Amino acid sequence: MPAPKQKARRFRAGPGAAPHRRPEGGARRQAQAQARARGAARPAPVVGTPFLIGHLADVLHMVLKLDGPADVLLSVYFKRNHELGSRDRGTLAETVYFALRHLASLSWAMAPAAPARAPRLAALVAVAWKYGRGELSEAAVGRDKEAIEAILAKPLERMPAAAKAEVPDWLYEKITAQYEDAEGFFRAIAEGAPLDIRVNSLKATVSEAMKELDAAGVAAVQMRYSPDGLRLKEKVGLGALPVYREGRIEIQDEGSQLIARLLAPKRREMVCDFCAGAGGKTLAIGAMMRSTGSLYAFDINAKRLEGMVPRLRRSGLDNVRRIAIRDEHDKRLGRLAAKFDRVLVDAPCSGTGTLRRNPDLRWRLSPEELSRINAVQASVLRSAAKLLKEGGRLVYATCSVLKEENQDVVEAFLAEHPEFVLKNAASVLEAQGVAFSEAEKVQFGDWFAMLPQRQDTDGFFAAVLEKTGKKPQPRG
């Protein structure tokens, strides 16, 4: 376990092993309490100390098993280790996400390190790469000095192409086959994602929210595309701010905000968010409906729907009905056939469009899992389409950048359902004041396809379908 913090000596020579025990804690907590009582500010931690390297190695040992989402595993670890201050937690989280974004490089550089040593070596190398070799203290490096020097001396330009791209081989092949600017995509997902927020138009205007954020010392700029969106210049905690607690803003990526606008719901309509999850798009749709009509939020995960409750309370929406269903074939859905004016199918997907903010996902995904998801997508779309009335609009959306989850699914559906027609997505958004360049319109075609390397959003796909009710006559 991690050793107590100690004053750092820079990495020059490393006599002795770095201690790796849980800190005793009593004297340390007493000193912290005395410092707080004196009003003394706690100095920023030196990253490469035995204390933080020990914790970082422990976290990486847990996270790199890839048994679950990194953010969930980090939260569990922090709850178990109360000796970590807020700055420590922030530093550890940043470094863990850095390691996950550069896991292929780390694995290549450390090979053939013994598995038992891998988390500790990965912790040391990640700190050296992210913060500079000088951040490693001698005590933290200890007897690993020779191994670390050898790893840091490896010529990374000799890595295989997929390792340079920081993705598995199979995903590298798919992305490079589909996109001419695949290298731009790989560079984009190597960086962190910005913090985007949507202004709740039921409670504030964009300018009012900007002023309130500015008064709280939070700098924001208006988004390039979303009329309701702001992008924060720096990532900050919003949870304590009244503008967030009172529901005037919600965290939501710009691309996700535009998905709701593609649905373009109107007041007093009957609308369905078929795979609502925690409700980010549900909230945006409800605000566009001005909390009128009926907005059904379906999901197979009752716990996720329950997580929507505090968000709904903050938002001021009272037109949302949350319904947990068994699956897309739930018998209760049959009673709602052809009842809805608008249906959003935010389909389960690989999440490859979110790799900037979920870097572990690329290592937890497999071709077999992708095939399973693909079958579910087609089934969900067919079931959701039955809910739409004639003349209604259906939006099929994913946060994937892979054609087989997007265009291929929709084209197969249209071939089976000639009563549906594809609408031009850019035109739908332009009618609402969202401007795209001519190059972007060419990029989209009839689809909506935002990409991190082109629009600086998460990767999102959507298709806008309308139900005409008129089946074409067979050709004679």
What residue spans do the PLM features occupy?
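Rossmann-like S-adenosyl-L-methionine
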Residues: 3-11, 21, 28-29, 207-476
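Class I Rossmann-like S-adenosyl-L-methionine
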Residues: 2-240, 339
